[in-house]
Amino acid sequence: MRILFISILIVLMSVKVRAQKTKIIYVGDPLCSWCYGFAPEIAMVKEHFDSLHFQVVIGGLRPYNTETMADLGDFLKEHWEAVEGRSKQPFNYGIIEDKTFVYDTEPPARAVIVMRELNRKAEFEFFKEVQHLFYVENKNTNDVKVYLPLLEKYEVDPEEFENTFESSWAKMEVKKDFQLAQQMNISGFPALLLDHEGKLYVVCKGYAKADAIIGAIEKVVGQ
């Protein structure tokens, strides 16, 4: 898990991409602790630029990992404390005491992909709910059943969600997001990019405050 302590990077990278409407691209992972800390900031950015297209890319923090909290607990606790101290987001450390819990970030990432398929407009809100499930409620995010109580508000059928989650399609689709993040040379999360007038700008890598991000984007798009 790479942690980048930077407040804002304005146009770190500018590469040619296919021209399209201006778009904010958020690269993160539901089980990334800095992404959880970043959640209120990116929500404010999204709300401020509500006229711009907003795309979520699941980066893949530790997909297919087989290590348990017995292996990673001390390491994770140190990072969670740092995130909590900086972001003031609430953390429940109880799950670290479950030494049998396998810290595999692929299932919650896949759950977000399934929501994208079944109700795209709800994807970002669901992403944040998955973060809350893990970091506050300490739910087992490897189990599809923990997501089902969330679905009614999004008008998603639980059986359809579960079947899609277990499908080979979903398992392949989440890999596409991981690969897309790699193609954009993003290996640390969170990261925020801006696709504007045929160029792709890296706005920030790592945790940053909303006001700094908003100012950086406005300098590029001229708002």
Over which residues does each language-model region extend?
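Bacterial Sec-dependent N-terminal signal peptides
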Residues: 1-21
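A structure-centric signal for secondary-structure junctions around beta-strands
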Residues: 21, 108, 188-189
